[in-house]
Amino acid sequence: MKSSYNLRSIAAKVVGQVLDQGQSLSALLPIHQRDVSDKDRALLQELCFGVLRVLPQLEWCIQQLMAKPLTGKQRTLHYLIMVGIYQLHYTRIPPHAALAETVEGAVALKRPQLKGLINGVLRQFQRQQEELLQREATHSSHYLHPSWLLARIEHAYPNNWRGIVEANNQRPPMWLRVNRLHHTREAYLNLLMQGGIEAFPHTEYSDAIRLASPCAVDQLPGFSQGWATVQDASAQGCVYWLDPQDGEQILDLCAAPGGKTTHILEAAPKSHVLAVDVDETRLGRVKENLLRLQMHAEVKQGDGRYPDSWCEARVFDRILLDAPCSATGVIRRHPDIKWLRRDRDIEELVALQKEILDAIWPHLKTGGTMVYATCSILPQENTQQVTGFLSRHADAALVDTGTSEIPGIQILPHADSGDGFFYAKLVKN
């Protein structure tokens, strides 16, 4: 940790690295959090996530307040102003403290000559805040999504697109998966209650618990001993539909960071699991999760398009393919997705998913089950992908889950429920 730092300037740098360099917030934030005190880490996360969540609104306000935007080498100061406006409108930080710390951020960014400009813009926002936000509410920026994504969501869900967009813009709930090898869900709910943590069971998934308010993992009973895992309810649905059994050979493809790998082993502790991911670095997270839960799985680096290179002629009873996707179902959890994704990415991802599906299908035993899953809400990656797959593979059949008229199950993000997700359960005849 640095002995002296300005938190607002760090937040502005992080936002700039996401928007200008295309870096992932979830990869960047832990690096920068190491430079601040324990008490400031949560605030740094709040400022970075918050600015990226409401970015179009902040951009629109700055356009009204400044005749000329800050560009080039001064661009980070533009993001510093965003951090300032976000604090004034969305946080309980006393305005005088938010102003003072944000203005001082210009010094930390080696632009002390711009302190007066930043102070003036933020004070102007304070004076005009109510009128500005009333005007902004009628502007397209109010939806807080890029226009291409908004158009895709509206086209796919003409009757409820506004509800999806609204859910995307909310803070996500915190879900836990109770490790059934240690406790029943009811027993763990009692442990939470004894610790003063209010929580609610999921109506369908027997291991899932939603916390009334998010908390640090070190406050959770037995977290370090593997009694529970932080995992969204919709992600837990993957293993629910896979229905793994003891003694089976199971492939978890695109496995990182390992939440589903460990869930399989909780549901079927005597199964033989191979966890594969193309990203060697992220496979480290799989190993960390296995270690925390004291479980064993075979972990390999491998590209799903070329399974013969990492599993040769091996076949599996069950395959879970949580495919690379647009992640449009988890925007509320990763708001940088809105600004890192491009419209052209969707077709590229659809082609990649198709390639992996076709490549891995021969490695499923006859009579075996494959669950194809994404954290996307776009039909091209989900229902249309599955329909195309079934048309290419005569030995593939869709298992009727009795829950939907479409091929597969599409979950949409909802305030008190899970993230946006899609599952299709396929069997090889």
Curated annotation (Swiss-Prot):
Its EC number is 2.1.1.176. GO terms for molecular function: RNA binding; rRNA (cytosine-C5-)-methyltransferase activity. The active site is at C375 (nucleophile). One of its GO terms (cellular component) is cytosol. Keywords: Cytoplasm, Methyltransferase, RNA-binding, rRNA processing, S-adenosyl-L-methionine, Transferase. It is found in: Cytoplasm. One of its GO terms (biological process) is regulation of DNA-templated transcription. CDD domains: AdoMet_MTases (cd02440), Methyltransferase_Sun (cd00620). Belongs to the class I-like SAM-binding methyltransferase superfamily. RsmB/NOP family. This is Ribosomal RNA small subunit methyltransferase B. It comes from Pectobacterium atrosepticum (strain SCRI 1043 / ATCC BAA-672). The gene is rsmB.
